[in-house]
Amino acid sequence: MAAGFFQAEMSILSSTLARSYSLPIRKTLMTFDFRIAMQRNPCLRIRRSCVAAFSSTPSHSRNFPIRGLEDVFVGYLFGRKKATEVAHVVWEQVIQKGDTVIDATCGNGNDTLAMLKMVMHDSVGCGGYVYAMDIQKDAIESTSSLLDQAVGSKEKECVKLFNLCHSKMGEIVPENARVRMVAFNLGYLPGGNKSIITLSDTTLSALKAAERILKPGGLISLVVYIGHPGGREELEVVEAFGSGLPVSDWICCKFQMLNRPLAPVLVFMFKREN
């Protein structure tokens, strides 16, 4: 049996997910327990087969609706993948070449680099832009250093770095920019000063800014770390914000381990293309 189970709370389950596990769609906040899925899906029920599936076979089986998510999701279910890896695969389903995206808490730069690779045109180098910001100067320097090591100077020009609080994102993006995604890692800088953390009030301001600038078909992605003082309160703010978004325009969900209370929580808010 897996070390932890997910609980996904959704304002509306997508039709593809509902079809995959034969679940009803309800216009209410509902709980999706993957223990039910494990009973209904042979791959999830047999751990040995699952491990073989995500370690040696190509992703996107005929029975799984989202390309690439099967491997990383089952890996996360069995403790072999990180929450950020799940987030990255979800991003790949949304971000297109040439898009404008925002890394609202760039930290050590790993998310920024992943976004850059998703928005760059292979033939022309740039095309898209990543606006990366962090309130800590050390984080900006770490991100810049990682980019220097990983990409060329031309590609690095596609990243705009800002030593600012994430609540200021509306001030750094050009007025005519259509933002495809805004991503957050909420908590403290890995390897940095643990007393410097993201705060509930500034995170709420940042979410409101993201809601305003995000284009239809865009995504707000959050990995919320809750093992530090203030982390759970910040998660509650994120949950309240997502729960308050209109169902007609947004699909909001949360993935959380049930028996690991300090594990990071994944939250996705997808803006519908009406």
UniProtKB/Swiss-Prot annotation:
<keyword id="KW-0819">tRNA processing</keyword>
<keyword id="KW-0809">Transit peptide</keyword>
<dbReference type="GO" id="GO:0003729">
    <property type="term" value="F:mRNA binding"/>
</dbReference>
<dbReference type="GO" id="GO:0008168">
    <property type="term" value="F:methyltransferase activity"/>
</dbReference>
<comment type="pathway">
    <text>tRNA modification.</text>
</comment>
<keyword id="KW-0808">Transferase</keyword>
<protein>
    <recommendedName>
        <fullName>tRNA (mnm(5)s(2)U34)-methyltransferase, chloroplastic</fullName>
        <ecNumber>2.1.1.61</ecNumber>
    </recommendedName>
</protein>
<feature type="binding site">
    <location>
        <position position="134"/>
    </location>
    <ligand>
        <name>S-adenosyl-L-methionine</name>
    </ligand>
</feature>
<dbReference type="GO" id="GO:0008033">
    <property type="term" value="P:tRNA processing"/>
</dbReference>
<dbReference type="InterPro" id="IPR010719">
    <property type="entry name" value="MnmM_MeTrfase"/>
</dbReference>
<comment type="function">
    <text>Involved in the biosynthesis of 5-methylaminomethyl-2-thiouridine (mnm(5)s(2)U) at the wobble position (U34) in tRNA. Catalyzes the transfer of a methyl group from S-adenosyl-L-methionine to nm(5)s(2)U34 to form mnm(5)s(2)U34.</text>
</comment>
<dbReference type="Pfam" id="PF06962">
    <property type="entry name" value="rRNA_methylase"/>
</dbReference>
<dbReference type="InterPro" id="IPR029063">
    <property type="entry name" value="SAM-dependent_MTases_sf"/>
</dbReference>
<comment type="similarity">
    <text>Belongs to the methyltransferase superfamily. MnmM family.</text>
</comment>
<feature type="binding site">
    <location>
        <position position="110"/>
    </location>
    <ligand>
        <name>S-adenosyl-L-methionine</name>
    </ligand>
</feature>
<dbReference type="GO" id="GO:0009507">
    <property type="term" value="C:chloroplast"/>
</dbReference>
<keyword id="KW-0150">Chloroplast</keyword>
<feature type="transit peptide" description="Chloroplast">
    <location>
        <begin position="1"/>
        <end position="50"/>
    </location>
</feature>
<feature type="binding site">
    <location>
        <position position="136"/>
    </location>
    <ligand>
        <name>S-adenosyl-L-methionine</name>
    </ligand>
</feature>
<feature type="binding site">
    <location>
        <position position="166"/>
    </location>
    <ligand>
        <name>S-adenosyl-L-methionine</name>
    </ligand>
</feature>
<dbReference type="GO" id="GO:0032259">
    <property type="term" value="P:methylation"/>
</dbReference>
<keyword id="KW-0949">S-adenosyl-L-methionine</keyword>
<feature type="binding site">
    <location>
        <position position="108"/>
    </location>
    <ligand>
        <name>S-adenosyl-L-methionine</name>
    </ligand>
</feature>
<keyword id="KW-0934">Plastid</keyword>
<keyword id="KW-0489">Methyltransferase</keyword>
